[in-house]
Amino acid sequence: MPDINESMLNQFRPVIRRFIDPIADRIALPADYITLTGFLVACAASAGYASGSLITGAALLAASGFIDVLDGAVARRRFRPTAFGGFLDSTLDRLSDGIIIIGITAGGFTGLLTGLLALHSGLMVSYVRARAESLGIECAVGIAERAERIIIILAGSLAGYLIHPWFMDAAIIVLAALGYFTMIQRMIYVWQRLK
């Protein structure tokens, strides 16, 4: 039985690594440069959404997500991972997450309140983990981590493009709800570890 505290995609990580690692082995570019590239592509995705194009935003978001997976593999296999590299990756991931939601909201695909709730829930998911880790507790738990959140946005984008733009709004509502649920999961996990 799967652990409710475990990321939905965690079971696929070995499969993803088998696909990504051979690509990472061919890349000589330092991981930090790849991280920065991924962030710039996320900014372009946000601009695509803001301009009213679900398909452009989604294509660039998918590319950014792929680059994000790739930078970790490059750091792990081609270069020695560094503390700053991990810090940079995490910081730019948070910026990317926020700017994507801003682009979707600016493009009119979701309401202002829904967009703000999605931003807030994403912020709290990250904050709870950072605060837990400052207490010495590894807190990479929860049903909807970053990869799951990106997939939800991509699914909403595709359905919104092919069927009706309302699906993008629905995806952001789901994103906000799962963000708060993940935050609560992490709070309970930390409470159990500290009691």
Curated annotation (Swiss-Prot):
The EC number(s) this enzyme carries: 2.7.8.39
Pathway: Lipid metabolism; phospholipid metabolism
UniProt-listed InterPro entries: AIP_synthase, archin_ph_syn, CDP-OH_P_trans, CDP-OH_PTrfase_TM_dom, CDP_ALCOHOL_P_TRANSF_CS
GO biological process, one term: phospholipid biosynthetic process
Main location: membrane
Membrane topology qualifier: Multi-pass membrane protein
Similarity comment text for this entry: Belongs to the CDP-alcohol phosphatidyltransferase class-I family.
Function (record text): Catalyzes the formation of archaetidylinositol phosphate (AIP) from CDP-archaeol (CDP-ArOH or CDP-2,3-bis-(O-phytanyl)-sn-glycerol) and 1L-myo-inositol 1-phosphate (IP or 1D-myo-inositol 3-phosphate). AIP is a precursor of archaetidyl-myo-inositol (AI), an ether-type inositol phospholipid ubiquitously distributed in archaea membranes and essential for glycolipid biosynthesis in archaea.
Protein name: Archaetidylinositol phosphate synthase
Source organism of the structure: Methanothermobacter thermautotrophicus (strain ATCC 29096 / DSM 1053 / JCM 10044 / NBRC 100330 / Delta H)
